[in-house]
């Protein structure tokens, strides 16, 4: 038997959508779990269960996006300590420094995950930041 096929047969894929996100009807899952890795979809700084962005700019939006990620991985039995990679997408690279301040505070008590950051335009809901994360499922 081909090893690649054997590996594919043993991979489990699970899709997770929170009750709050389910109400919004987005065409994607909050997270996809492949074996023991959680891939969290891009999160913006919206209030859970709404499309309303938190006010105050990049700092509060960053904190809220990370709290949204934390909520998702907590519901899956993991914690912020289990996050090992983040991808931050900014609508304006000039927000990099202020985003870093909020990001640093969020990960202050845990080991900081590896991260990539870039800027583009047209983020979902008009957000200033969107963050994807990968975490180990406990």
Residue ranges and their predicted role:
Residues 1-67, 71-81, 90-138:
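N-terminal presequence-like segments and the immediate start of the first folded domain
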């Amino acid at each position: 038997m081909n090893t690649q096929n054997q590996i594919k047969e043993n991979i489990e894929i699970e899709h997770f959508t929170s009750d709050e996100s389910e109400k919004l009807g987005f065409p994607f899952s909050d997270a996809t779990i492949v074996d023991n890795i959680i891939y969290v979809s891009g999160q913006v700084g919206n209030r859970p269960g709404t499309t309303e962005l938190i006010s105050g700019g990049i700092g509060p939006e960053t904190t809220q996006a990370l709290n949204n990620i934390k909520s998702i991985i907590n519901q899956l039995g993991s914690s912020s300590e289990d996050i090992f990679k983040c991808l931050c997408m900014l609508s304006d690279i000039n927000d990099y420094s202020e985003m870093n301040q909020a990001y640093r505070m969020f990960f202050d008590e845990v080991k900081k995950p590896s991260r990539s950051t870039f800027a583009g335009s047209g983020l979902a809901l008009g957000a200033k930041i969107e963050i994807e994360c990968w975490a180990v499922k406990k």
